[in-house]
């Protein structure tokens, strides 16, 4: 927001006013995860587990073959960005599993 000065000429001419801050458009929330969608995905993950390609990628991540895992996932899911997101998700899952195993012992 630009501070308006009481000048008769220039870009900031005119009466000082406070700008109305409008709410962001509803169309801007496309792609944001809702509570219900997160719950549904977590439930499905709990019931179904991981797909075979995800299990193989997790095995590659376990032996520190991150780049190979990325190439493998990219071949399966299609795009580089989706593959990076999937690799991150699987590595977070592995870390959580390691943490749970350490807590158990």
UniProtKB/Swiss-Prot annotation:
GO terms for molecular function: structural constituent of ribosome. Component of the large ribosomal subunit. PANTHER family: 60S RIBOSOMAL PROTEIN L36 (PTHR10114). The gene is rpl36. PROSITE patterns: RIBOSOMAL_L36E. It is found in: Cytoplasm, Cytosol; Cytoplasm. Keywords: Cytoplasm, Ribonucleoprotein, Ribosomal protein. It comes from Danio rerio. One of its GO terms (biological process) is cytoplasmic translation. Its main location: cytoplasm. GO terms for cellular component: cytosolic large ribosomal subunit. Belongs to the eukaryotic ribosomal protein eL36 family. Component of the large ribosomal subunit. The ribosome is a large ribonucleoprotein complex responsible for the synthesis of proteins in the cell. This is Large ribosomal subunit protein eL36.
């Amino acid at each position: 927001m630009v501070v308006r000065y009481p000048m008769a000429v220039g870009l900031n001419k005119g009466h000082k006013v406070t700008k109305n801050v409008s709410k962001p458009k509803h169309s801007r929330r496309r792609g944001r995860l809702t509570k219900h969608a997160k719950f549904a995905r977590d439930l499905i993950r709990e019931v179904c587990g991981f797909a075979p390609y995800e299990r193989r990628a997790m095995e590659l991540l376990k032996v520190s073959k991150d780049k190979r895992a990325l190439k493998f996932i990219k071949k399966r899911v299609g795009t580089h960005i989706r593959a990076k997101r999937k690799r991150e998700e699987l590595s977070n899952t592995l870390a959580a599993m390691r943490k749970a195993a350490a807590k158990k012992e």
